[in-house]
C-alpha cells in the first residue's frame, strides 16, 4: 500500500503562494512499526483506526461559500438529503471550530488572501474540498480576475465535479473524504513543527468507474431521468 508523505517547507519566501508543501511516495509507516515490534505496532495501528474513525464521523464544515455551488451545498443540509446522517451537519461560523473547508464557487483573485487567512486559522487536522467546475479549474471564467483552480493556492484533498454539483455529489464527496481520513497516518499527540502527515493515494472515481461506464450500452435520456425523479418525489 502506497502513501503520500506531506512535509512542510521552511525555505519559502514571504511572497510565495500555496501550496507550501512537498510530496513524495512512501510506504505505510505503520508496517515498519509492526515489523520492529508486533505488539506495539498492532496497538499503534488500532489507535490510528479508532482516532480516524472519530475524525471521519464528526466532520464539521466551515460555513463559507463563494457562488452558486454554495446553494447546492446548503441544500444537502435540508431534510430531503439529511447530511446529519454522516455527522457533518454542524456548520461552524468560525474557522477555528471547523474541520474542513468547502470552496464552493468561483475563487476570484481578490478573495485568495482572504481564503488563505481563513485556512490558516483552521486547526489541524483540517481538509479542503474543491466543489464545482469553477473551484476545480476556473470553469468557464478563463479571465484575469478568476484563479484557475483552488489548488493554485491551497492544498486540496477532494475535488467534486459539476456546474453546479448536485447535493448528492456533495454527500458522495463527504463519504470519499471519510474513506480517505480512515487511511491517514497522523501524530496521535501534540507535535511542534512538521507533522509528517501520511495520506493514502486514493483512486479517482472516474478511473474506478471507467470500465463500467464504457461497458454500458443502454443509456437513458434526460427526459426519462426527469420523469423517474418526478415520480419518486410525488410530482405530477
UniProtKB/Swiss-Prot annotation:
SUPFAM superfamilies: HydA/Nqo6-like. It is an enzyme of class 7 (translocase). NDH-1 shuttles electrons from NADH, via FMN and iron-sulfur (Fe-S) centers, to quinones in the respiratory chain. The immediate electron acceptor for the enzyme in this species is believed to be ubiquinone. Couples the redox reaction to proton translocation (for every two electrons transferred, four hydrogen ions are translocated across the cytoplasmic membrane), and thus conserves the redox energy in a proton gradient. Binds 1 [4Fe-4S] cluster. Its cofactor is [4Fe-4S] cluster. Belongs to the complex I 20 kDa subunit family. This is NADH-quinone oxidoreductase subunit B. One of its GO terms (biological process) is aerobic respiration. It comes from Blochmanniella pennsylvanica (strain BPEN). It catalyses: a quinone + NADH + 5 H(+)(in) = a quinol + NAD(+) + 4 H(+)(out). [4Fe-4S] cluster binds at residues 68-69, 134, 163. GO terms for cellular component: plasma membrane; respiratory chain complex I. Its EC number is 7.1.1.-. It is found in: Cell inner membrane. InterPro entries: NADH_UbQ_OxRdtase-like_20kDa (IPR006137), NADH_UQ_OxRdtase_20Kd_su (IPR006138). NDH-1 is composed of 13 different subunits. Subunits NuoB, CD, E, F, and G constitute the peripheral sector of the complex. GO terms for molecular function: 4 iron, 4 sulfur cluster binding; iron ion binding; NADH dehydrogenase (ubiquinone) activity; NADH:ubiquinone reductase (non-electrogenic) activity; quinone binding. Pfam families: Oxidored_q6. It is a peripheral membrane protein. NCBIfam families: nuoB_fam (TIGR01957), PRK06411.1 (NF005012). Keywords: 4Fe-4S, Cell inner membrane, Cell membrane, Iron, Iron-sulfur, Membrane, Metal-binding, NAD, Quinone, Translocase, Transport, Ubiquinone.
